[in-house]
Structure formats: C-alpha cells, structure tokens
A protein has these predicted regions:
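Bacterial Sec-dependent N-terminal signal peptides
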Residues: 1-29
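Membrane-proximal, proline-rich intrinsically disordered regions
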Residues: 19-66, 310-322, 527-542
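Conserved, well-structured interaction surfaces
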Residues: 41-52, 56-61, 83-153, 169-182, ...
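Hydrophobic, small-residue-rich alpha-helical packing segments that form membrane-like cores
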Residues: 158-261
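Long, intrinsically disordered, low-complexity segments
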Residues: 18-20, 93, 97, 107-110, ...
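Flexible, polar/acidic helix-loop-strand segments at domain edges
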Residues: 325-401
Length: 542
C-alpha cells in the first residue's frame, strides 16, 4: 500500500471518529474495504491499526467531564471550579439536551467500528489464528461498549453484526434490560477462549485477553443482580455473579503490595485490562494543590469521602471504641486516605500541604482552589519528597483484581454465601491497604457479622478502594441508594491555624438534588428525533 493510500485511510478513520450519529450510515464502510482491509496486507497491519483505533474509544477517567472527574458529580467530590458541567449531576440539571457524560454516540461508533471490522477482516490474508483472535477482540470491545450504554440508559437497541448503510431503516426499538445483559454475557462467553491467554507478552499488553472478558462478565452480572436491575431480588442472579467472580479469581491474578505505585504501573499482576496512555504529568498538574508548580487543583474531594476511610485498626471513625481524634483527624487512619486525598499537613513536593485558611494551597481570593479543604492525590506519582513532577504512567485501569474481590464479596453476601468466604475477600483488600491485622487476624472484621452489616462494610470498602475510578456513580445507582446519598449535602472542612495547632469546622460545601428518574440517563433528544421507535426513559421529557 503506497503512502497516498495510507494517507487516505487515515483521513477515513478521522472522519469515522468525527461522526456523531450512531445509526446514520457513514461512508466508512464504502472506503475502507480496499484501503484498510487490504487483500495485499499479509501481516494485517492496517486491519490491526483499525482495531487499535477502536480500543481508543474505551472510557477515560481523568478530568474528562469539563475538567472534572465524574466522581465530582457524586458525594465523593466537587469540582474546584464552580459551575462546571460535572455539577449538573449533583444539582439535577441533566436533561435529554444537557448531558455532559453523553457517550451514546461514542459507544455506538465503537459498536459500528467493531461490526465493520468483523464484516471485512476476512479479506485480509493473515493467519486464521490471528483473524480469530482479532475477531474476538472486536466482539469484546463491542460488549464493553454495550455495557457502557446499558449502565447509563438501561435497555438499548442491539444491532448484532449489522453495519448500517444509507438505505437502511434506522428506526430500531430498544431491547429490554435483561436482553442486553444476556447478549453481553453470551458474547463474552463465546469469545473468551479465542482471546489472548491470561499471561500475555509486553507487546500485547493493553489488548483484551481471557481475563478481561471474564472480569467484564463479573461486573456485568453484578450489575444485573443489583436492586436497580433486579427489583425482585432473584437470588440466582447473585449466585451467577458470585460464580463469575470466582472464575476470575481462579485465573491467578493477585494484588500488588504497593497500593500507591499500583496506579502508576505499566504492567502488574493486579491489572486485568487497561487503556494505555503515554507518560505524562497531566494528573499531577490538573489535580495537584495550587501552591505547587503548575498545580491547578481541579478536584476537591469531600469530607463525606474522608469520613468513609477507616481507622488503622479497621474500625469506622464512628464505631464504639474508635480511636478517632477530632483534634487530629488524619492520625492513625487507613493508609489509603493519604494515598487518595491531599489533606492539611500531608507532605508533597518537599513541604506540608497547607489547606488551612490563608495557607499556600488555600490562599482565598478569586483563584480556583479547593472548595472542601482537600485535593486529590490518587493516581499521582510518589512526589512527597521530590522538587518537581516527572512523567508518569497514567493508564486507565478499566478492570483490576481488587474489584473482582469486592464483586465476589458482595455477590456471596447477597446470595447467602459463607461469612468466612466473604470476609476472606475483604481481608485481602484490607491487608494490602495496610490495615492492622488485629488479635483475630481479620483486619477489623469478624465472622459474626450479619448480612446487613456485611453489606454496609462491602459498600464502604468499594467506595474507598475504588474512589475516583468511576464506580461511585454507578454503585449508588445500582444499589438504589442514590436517592438517599445524593440528596445529602457534600461537606468540606474549614481549617484555622492557631500557632502550631489547628481547629476544624465542618460545613456544607455544595447542595445536592437527586430525583429517582435520574437512576437512568435521559436518552439524548437527537436520538429520539432520529429514531421514531426510540422510547424515552421514564420521567424524562422527549
């Protein structure tokens, strides 16, 4: 293929990414047949590049909603800049025309690209083994894109392998929620053995493998079993979710010992599936405290989240017998607190963070700064004693083993599993975090906990272990707790320095409004207008 053809192929790909209507026929299918899917491309180089481009449509986390994390629309944080679109979620301002997290078109574009790949890759004269693997990867990506749609909107149109053309009828009804879950799971089951194995080479890192398919299945079945999707509490759904998580555990993934370094690794035993990024300092600059270098401090974690972190002995700060000291609130806490959140007095770039009133990181005035008394620390490199930021790996860790352990604990608890098995999953999480083992070697847990007690513990463990990894938004919805937790104010702390001592006053940093119709996103108005069979979600006007 000469340079001119390669150039045209690239233009075609860019055009595909720019298309905004998911069912409208794009000329992509007419111009890629002999350019990207080339009968002379014996190594499948261009087909692989097209597939790689489809991977780029996988989700991002970092500051993606108008400069904020999606979690800044929950009770875990607020955007430091007032009025950013992430606040629409907390204030109830989303609508079918105002949806900052509108990934409908993006995910249907991914589905279309996967279908186009499946329909054309057979003309490429590469090996049957490689074709089988690539087809399985395309189907995995398609399943992932469908789940991104389903967790937001519920049932969506399933279009199978069809690649729509200009002359096709694009009026397609929504499938039911259960049909969508069943389709995704069936696809993952069908292709898992054709994907790369559990152990993959460095050159294939970031590609879907059997672990990714099984881990995504675990997540999908957990959502399908949860109250939002399972209002009758069908225990069999929880049992299926428990088995799916157990199957992933059997593959051999393990937790890494260094919780902080985990998020700047390129490859390790905990990562199951990642979206790769180039080395950069974007997270540090966008979220670092404003008194350092170019720190923009765009994310303000909440007091609500700070209070969720345990004491070092594994007890909640509100537990009877807790050693929590209101005059020294960050002392003897779960190490994940200071690994997730910058609080006053934490060392960073060679000096203590100053979020007291008038401090270097909370100077007052009109400059964007923390609204809660906290800054984000998670995902950053170990710069506590450094003088400057250096490039770090900031891959998007889409699936990791810690989530699987939490999935297993939750599904076992809801399906009537043995308390010891449930607790063992949590012990692994807490032990790695640095919680003390205690006299019973159960890291603040016990084998006499009730189902309801374990449920609360598991939910809180997910909150702190997976903070800012885009789980809180969906967890609160699938548990049907959003109407409770997201109607509470998001709290912050005002710190006054008195000599060498500090006083702490807690306040409401932002109000919150959650209506039950917000459990499911409104379908974008443009999709309703374009498809006369598309039915809007309950409570939302067209």
């Amino acid at each position: 293929m000469n340079n001119y053809k390669i150039y045209i192929a690239i233009i075609c790909l860019l055009f595909a990414f720019g298309c905004s209507k998911k069912f409208e026929a794009e000329p992509l299918d007419r111009i890629t047949g002999d350019l990207i899917f080339d009968p002379l491309d014996k190594n499948a180089d261009y087909a692989k590049q097209f597939l790689n481009g489809t991977y780029l449509l996988l989700p991002d986390w970092y500051n993606r909603i108008d400069g904020s994390f999606l979690d800044a629309g929950t009770d875990d944080a607020v955007p430091s800049r007032i009025g950013t679109q992430a606040e629409f979620y907390r204030t109830g301002r989303i609508s079918s025309t105002t949806l900052p997290d509108d990934v409908w078109s993006k995910n249907y574009l991914g589905i279309r690209r996967a279908n186009l790949f499946l329909s054309k890759v057979d003309v490429v004269p590469t090996t049957a083994v490689l074709k089988t693997q690539f087809k399985a990867e395309a189907r995995f990506l398609r399943a992932y894109f469908y789940f991104e749609l389903v967790k937001r909107w519920g049932g969506v149109p399933l279009i199978g392998d069809k690649v729509y053309t200009i002359n096709d009828d694009i009026n397609v009804p929504r499938n039911t929620l259960d049909e969508c879950y069943a389709y995704i799971v069936a696809e993952l089951d069908a292709i898992k053995s054709s994907l790369l194995p559990y152990a993959i080479t460095d050159g294939d890192w970031g590609r879907a493998n059997i672990g990714a398919a099984m881990a995504l299945k675990s997540r999908v079945l957990l959502y399908a079993a949860s109250p939002l999707s399972n209002p009758t509490n069908n225990i069999q759904k929880w049992a299926l979710a428990a088995q799916a998580a157990a199957d992933v555990k059997a593959l051999g993934y393990t937790l890494v010992t260094d919780w902080v370094a985990n998020f700047n690794a390129t490859k390790n035993t905990e990562f199951i599936f990642i979206k790769q990024n180039v080395l950069n300092t974007n997270i540090e600059i966008n979220n670092g405290p404003i008194g350092y270098l170019q720190g923009l401090g765009l994310t303000s974690p909440s007091q609500n989240l700070v209070d969720a972190f345990l004491m070092l002995d594994g007890k909640a700060i509100s537990d009877a017998g807790s050693t929590y000291d209101s005059n020294n609130p960050y002392l003897n806490r779960d190490p994940r607190l200071t690994a997730t959140i910058m609080h006053n007095g934490k060392n960073w770039l060679g000096r203590p963070v100053e979020t007291f009133e008038g401090g270097q990181d909370k100077p007052g005035g009109n400059r964007t700064q923390t609204r809660t008394g906290y800054y984000l620390r998670k995902f950053m490199g170990k710069f506590e004693t450094s003088t400057t930021y250096t490039n770090q790996a900031h891959h998007v860790i889409l699936l990791r083993y810690a989530e699987i352990l939490l999935n297993h604990a939750e599904a076992l608890n809801e399906s009537g599993g043995a308390v010891a098995d449930i607790v063992n999953n949590l012990v692994l999480i807490r032990k790695r975090a640095g919680i003390l083992p205690g006299s019973n070697n159960l890291y603040g847990l016990s084998l006499t906990l009730s189902k309801d007690e374990l449920r609360k513990i598991i939910q809180n463990e997910r909150r702190i272990e997976l903070a800012f990894e885009e789980h809180r938004t969906w967890d609160l919805r699938r548990w049907k707790l959003a109407e409770i937790e997201l109607n509470k104010p998001v709290r912050g702390v005002q710190i006054i320095k008195n000599g060498t001592a500090y006083s702490y006053t807690y306040f409401n940093a932002a109000n919150a409004v959650f209506d039950t119709k917000m459990y499911w996103y409104p379908i974008p108005q443009a999709e309703i207008l374009a498809n006369n069979k598309m039915v809007q979600n309950p409570g939302w006007p067209n």
